[in-house]
């Protein structure tokens, strides 16, 4: 089973190599990179390309590792016991299978996405070490050992909000998705907007990378935000020439709210771009 790329996702050679290396080693692929660089979509497209189901576990700050295995609803069982419900005699009625259990019990290999693992507390990755390494876990309430019928292809994404434990890192294959250069970005845009006029693409790309290169910017726009912006430009039929105005009143690009998400960044960009374009006039 090998990933050969996807017509809906621009995968660089090194990224494709990393995916296949993780599959060969049967280790989770830990993917880091700026927000909006396609870390989550990578798992989606790999699943589509390989023709296997996708299971997604989106991590929050309150998520516990146990939830990925299973949860035992003791409160509901106690309530049913008090009401004389017949369901109470079978403990399986009160066990909710987590994403790892679903992946382990699947009748065919699946892609399992553990998304934004760094949002959880620092012990979260360590609490999954044994389960991801041995592909099994024990259910104490039913005294059964759950083993993976087929080893899932595991993708783990991180935005680098927290450092991950060394013991966890040793069990992963790592890849950092670098922010796309202009050539790669044009390919990405081409996948989403194949009929986009070259003039609009050229001007939009110039503005986008100009925004990203502004020193002191609090939040640089991401790939996904560029795609949102282009979608709006097309919907509003904004011409290419409107993106490069030298007029102080219109120097900020139309619909800039898709790119700049902070008022200080808007003012900073406006000031620097006006000075740059005024010099070039």
Language-model regions, residue ranges each:
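C-terminal regulatory/interaction module of P-loop NTP-utilizing enzymes
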Residues: 1-281
């Amino acid at each position: 089973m090998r990933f050969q790329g996807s017509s809906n996702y621009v995968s660089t050679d090194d990224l494709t190599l990393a995916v296949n290396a993780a599959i060969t080693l049967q280790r989770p692929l830990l993917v880091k990179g700026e927000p909006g660089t396609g870390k989550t979509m990578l798992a989606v497209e790999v699943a589509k390309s390989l023709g296997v189901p996708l299971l997604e576990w989106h991590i929050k700050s309150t998520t516990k590792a146990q939830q990925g295995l299973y949860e035992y609803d003791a409160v509901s069982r106690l309530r049913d016991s008090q009401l004389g419900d017949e369901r109470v005699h079978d403990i399986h009625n009160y066990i909710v299978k987590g994403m790892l259990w679903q992946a382990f019990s699947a009748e065919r290999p699946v892609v399992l996405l553990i998304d934004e693992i760094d949002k959880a507390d620092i012990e979260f990755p360590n609490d999954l070490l044994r389960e991801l390494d041995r592909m099994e876990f024990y259910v104490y309430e039913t005294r059964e050992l759950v083993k993976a019928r087929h080893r899932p292809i595991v993708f783990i994404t991180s935005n680098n909000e927290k450092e991950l434990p060394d013991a966890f890192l040793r069990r992963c294959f790592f890849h950092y998705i670098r922010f796309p250069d202009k050539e790669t970005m044009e390919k990405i845009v081409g996948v989403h907007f194949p009929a986009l006029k070259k003039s609009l693409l050229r001007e939009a790309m110039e503005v986008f990378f100009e925004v990203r290169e502004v020193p002191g910017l609090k939040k640089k726009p991401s790939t996904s935000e560029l795609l949102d912006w282009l979608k709006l430009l097309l919907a509003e039929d904004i011409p290419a020439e409107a993106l490069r105005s030298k007029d102080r009143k219109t120097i900020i690009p139309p619909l800039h709210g898709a790119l700049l998400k902070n008022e200080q960044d808007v003012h900073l960009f406006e000031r620097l771009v006006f000075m740059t374009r005024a010099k070039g006039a």
